[in-house]
Amino acid sequence: MEYLSALNPSDLLRSVSNISSEFGRRVWTSAPPPQRPFRVCDHKRTIRKGLTAATRQELLAKALETLLLNGVLTLVLEEDGTAVDSEDFFQLLEDDTCLMVLQSGQSWSPTRSGVLSYGLGRERPKHSKDIARFTFDVYKQNPRDLFGSLNVKATFYGLYSMSCDFQGLGPKKVLRELLRWTSTLLQGLGHMLLGISSTLRHAVEGAEQWQQKGRLHSY
């Protein structure tokens, strides 16, 4: 009691504040941001990769290795070329955002509309109007995936858009699904064989009974 009475209230309050600040700092630093999926491409959009990263620097490091780039890299949005130059902006991006990685001297350019966009081998007429446009993007989020993931995006009349993402499966998941389907198929085949066997048995028994009745009538 004498020790508590000798304490200065301001010193006690400062000690409690320091302890709470230190505890909050440790809790904050011990919880790193989670890994999130992104899709990155080079400035010509010829190479596309699916990468997972928790921070902007981590994504740039993985893109440097995966896309075989060098030098200082710049990260921009593929859609409109907006620079992703801060970690705060990067954390605001949604999952599966399409990003473009630029090397020194390279610049963003819009997507070209031409033969591949319309698929008929002819350029789009000048006074035509879009009814529907479909974009297919195949990518891998993990190098161990056997099949890449597929993203399908549909835009109607240039106003309404919707997208569907089909995630790829790794070797273990593919093997598990294959075994599950094989087991189901074998079970169905077993039931079918049992049904055929029962039908044949009834047919044989019926034939034997018919033969026995025929012999009795002959006597």
Swiss-Prot record:
One of its GO terms (biological process) is response to nutrient levels. The keyword Lyase does not apply. It is a peripheral membrane protein. PROSITE patterns: CIDE_N. InterPro entries: CIDE-N_dom. Its main location: other. Residues 34-110 form the CIDE-N domain. Belongs to the CIDE family. Keywords: Apoptosis, Cytoplasmic vesicle, Endoplasmic reticulum, Golgi apparatus, Host-virus interaction, Lipid droplet, Membrane, Phosphoprotein. It holds the Pfam family CIDE-N. Highly expressed in liver and small intestine and, at lower levels, in colon, kidney and spleen. This is Lipid transferase CIDEB. Lipid transferase specifically expressed in hepatocytes, which promotes unilocular lipid droplet formation by mediating lipid droplet fusion. Lipid droplet fusion promotes their enlargement, restricting lipolysis and favoring lipid storage. Localizes on the lipid droplet surface, at focal contact sites between lipid droplets, and mediates atypical lipid droplet fusion by promoting directional net neutral lipid transfer from the smaller to larger lipid droplets. The transfer direction may be driven by the internal pressure difference between the contacting lipid droplet pair. (Microbial infection) Involved in Hepatatis C virus (HCV) assembly and required for HCV entry into hepatocytes. Interacts with DFFA. Interacts with DFFB; inhibited by DFFB. Interacts with APOB. Interacts with PREB/SEC12; facilitating loading of SCAP-SREBP into COPII vesicles. (Microbial infection) Interacts (via N-terminus) with HCV non-structural protein 5A (via N-terminus); this interaction seems to regulate the association of HCV particles with ApoE. It is found in: Lipid droplet; Endoplasmic reticulum membrane; Golgi apparatus; Cytoplasmic vesicle, COPI-coated vesicle. GO terms for cellular component: COPI-coated vesicle; COPII vesicle coat; cytosol; endoplasmic reticulum; endoplasmic reticulum membrane; Golgi apparatus; lipid droplet; perinuclear region of cytoplasm. The keyword Acyltransferase does not apply. GO terms for molecular function: identical protein binding; lipid transfer activity; molecular adaptor activity; phosphatidic acid binding.
